[in-house]
């Protein structure tokens, strides 16, 4: 089971890293850095946010690996929290690479019984697969359209973990809403979406909202309002 699962992850990873590998090998490709001058004209809460989280000259994050532990509610109607561990690999749009991520997790359902789960956005396609012990498939959804948009939405909502990905130079377009909120638009190929970012009293992003995100209810995809909350900010690598 583990071997088969690892082979799947290796294939996905090759796809994720492909555009970045081409970029890194390109002759004369400069290392890019954040320039505070690009904040000119941004909505006030967005301007304040970048001044708070970035220093002039900060290297643009091109890729990151995140180790996670936590609990996940396995039911939409009851409290069924299960522990999980995971590794997430992210590639941003830095200097022309294609945005994407792979979340490779193990959820402990019962003692000795784990479910392997992968959630990803690679080369413009979304993927969600789950297999008991990495062998017996219990969920398998892949494709473009709303599936891809939903996974790109996850990528976009998690960008405060690597905030240079939210800069205008990285393809994000900001529009004003009020003193504590702004809308941001991101496009990747045919997939484009706009999310509402809200900023707290300290200037940090505390929520990211979408009017609708697809989620599976039984065998049908249902569009529902969606929100990601953020808190407990810490400094990493100068950000």
Where are these regions (language model features)?
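N-terminal leader/targeting segments and the immediate start of mature chains
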Residues: 9-65
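A short, polar/proline- and glycine-enriched secondary-structure boundary/capping micro-motif
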Residues: 111-117, 137-142, 194-196, 217-222
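Gly/Pro-enriched, hydrophobic low-complexity segments
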Residues: 183-239
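Flexible, processing/modification-adjacent segments and terminal tails
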Residues: 129-188
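Residues that act as N-cap/strand-start positions at coil-to-secondary-structure junctions
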Residues: 82-84, 168, 178-180, 191, ...
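Hydrophobic membrane-insertion alpha-helices, especially the h-region
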Residues: 1-4
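Short, ordered beta-strand-loop transition motifs
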Residues: 94-97, 121-122, 173-181, 236
């Amino acid at each position: 089971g583990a071997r088969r699962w690892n082979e799947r992850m290796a294939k996905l990873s090759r796809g994720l890293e492909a555009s970045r590998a081409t970029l890194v090998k390109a002759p004369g490709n400069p290392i890019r850095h954040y320039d505070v001058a690009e904040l000119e004209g941004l909505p006030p809460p967005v301007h304040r946010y970048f001044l708070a989280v970035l220093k002039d000259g900060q290297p643009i994050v091109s890729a990151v690996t995140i180790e996670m532990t936590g609990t996940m509610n396995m039911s939409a109607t009851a409290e069924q929290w299960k522990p999980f561990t995971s590794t997430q690999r992210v590639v941003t749009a830095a200097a022309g690479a294609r945005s994407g991520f792979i979340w490779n997790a193990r959820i402990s359902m019962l003692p000795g019984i784990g479910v392997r789960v992968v959630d990803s956005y690679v080369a413009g396609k979304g993927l969600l697969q789950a297999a008991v012990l990495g062998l017996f498939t219990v969920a398998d959804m892949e494709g473009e359209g709303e599936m891809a948009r939903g996974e790109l939405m996850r990528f976009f909502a998690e960008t405060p973990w690597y905030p240079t990905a939210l800069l205008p130079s990285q393809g994000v377009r900001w529009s004003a809403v009020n003193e504590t909120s702004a809308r941001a638009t991101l496009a990747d190929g045919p997939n484009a979406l706009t999310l509402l970012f809200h900023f707290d009293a300290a200037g940090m992003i505390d929520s990211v909202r979408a009017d609708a995100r697809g989620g599976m209810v039984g065998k049908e995809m249902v569009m529902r309002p969606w929100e990601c909350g953020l808190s407990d900010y810490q400094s990493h690598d100068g950000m």
